[in-house]
Amino acid sequence: MRFLDAGETHGKALIAIIEGFPAHVKIDIENINHLLQLRQRGYGRGKRMEIEKDRVKILSGVRNSFTTGAPITLMIENRDYENWRSFMDATQCDVDTKKVTVPRPGHADLAGCLKYEFDDARNVLERASARETAIRVAVGAVCEELLKMFGIKLYNHVVEIGRVRLTKSYSFDDTELFEQALSSSDLFCIDKEAEMKMKEEIDIAKQIGDSVGGIAEVICKNVPYGIGSHVHWDRKLDAQIAHSVMSIQSVKGVEIGMGFEAARRFGSEVHDEIYYDDKKGFYRKTNNAGGIEGGISNGMDIVVRAAFKPIPTLYKPLKSVDIRTFQPAEAAVERSDICAVPAGSIVMRAAIAYVLANALIERLGGDSAKTMLETFKRIYNKG
C-alpha cells in the first residue's frame, strides 16, 4: 500500500490517493471527519481554524461504504481559497502582492528557494505548510478502519508543552483516560493541573510574540506479534514508524518505548525479561522496548513519542535576509498558530496508523480484508 497527496495551503483543495488498500473494509466517513475535527482543535491554534471546517469527500475506491480494492481518492476543500483565488489560480494570478522574499528561520523557505531557484518563498511555503497534514489525517483515519477489524486501536495524548511536563502517572491500559482527554481537554492532556500550566506556557509565548513546542505520545493497543521484519533495514517496523513520524512538519525527534532514556541505563534496567504461561503464552512484565524488538512487533503495546519544535512563524520576527537584496530584514510573518502540539498528536497517530496498516497488509496479504481475517485467525488462533 502507498499513498500520494497533493495541494497547497491556500490552494483549492488537498487530495490523496491510496493505492493497494484491501477490498471489503467498511469506511465510516464520520470517523474520518471526527479525526479531522480533532486536528483543528487545541489551545493555541490560529485564526485559520475559524475559517476551515474540514470534511472529507471520497471520490473513488469506496462504494456503499465499503472499499473495492481500487485506488481510494480523498479530497478536503480549502474554504480559504476564495480569499486567495486571485493569488493562487493555476492559470493566471497576481504573483507580486503576496510575494515572500524574507525567509523565516526554521521553515523550508530559504532551503526551498535555493533548491528550486525561486525568488518567491510563496512557492515553497504553500506546499511545506502543515495544512498538508489535514489530508494525511484522512489517510490515517481510513487505515484505522482496517486496523479496527483486527482489534488494533490507537490513542494519542500530549505529555509536554514547552517547559511544562505531565507528572501524573498513568498506565498504557488507561484507555478511558486517553479518550476523555480527547473529548474534554483543549490540549489532549490527561492531567487537568498540568493542562492549566501548559496553557499558561502558551499564553506567555503569545504575549511575547513567540511560539512553543512540546511532546506527544501515541499508544497502539492489540498489535499482534510478527508485524515488520528484521531481515532488511527498510522492513523494520520501528524504522518505518520513525520515518513516517519524522516526516510530519515540526517533528525533530522520535523515540519508541524507553527511547533516549535507555542510553542512560544499564542493560539489566532496560531489556524486558521474558516469561511463559500456559494460558498467556510468552509475556513481559515491563515494556521498555515499546512493543518492537529487532524491527518486529512482539505483541506488547507499541509506544511512540515525538518532539515537536516551536512553530517557525513568530509574531515578533527573528532576523533574516531579503533574498532579492541580500540586506538584513525581519522574517516574514504568515498567519500561524502559537502551539500546534495537540493537532500534531492527531497527525502523528495518522502517520503511525498508515505504517501499521501497511505492515499488516504485508503480513496477511492485502487484496481482500476477508482473506486477511482468515489468515489472521489461522496464525493467531483467533475466533
From Swiss-Prot:
The keyword Lyase applies. One of its GO terms (cellular component) is cytosol. GO terms for biological process: amino acid biosynthetic process; aromatic amino acid family biosynthetic process; chorismate biosynthetic process. Pathway: Metabolic intermediate biosynthesis; chorismate biosynthesis; chorismate from D-erythrose 4-phosphate and phosphoenolpyruvate: step 7/7. Its cofactor is FMNH2. It comes from the Bacteria. It catalyses: 5-O-(1-carboxyvinyl)-3-phosphoshikimate = chorismate + phosphate. Reduced FMN (FMNH(2)). NADP(+) binds at residues 39, 45. PANTHER family: CHORISMATE SYNTHASE (PTHR21085:SF0). Belongs to the chorismate synthase family. NCBIfam families: aroC, PRK05382.1. HAMAP family: Chorismate_synth (MF_00300). Homotetramer. This reaction introduces a second double bond into the aromatic ring system. This is Chorismate synthase. It comes from Caldicellulosiruptor bescii (strain ATCC BAA-1888 / DSM 6725 / KCTC 15123 / Z-1320) (Anaerocellum thermophilum). The gene is aroC.
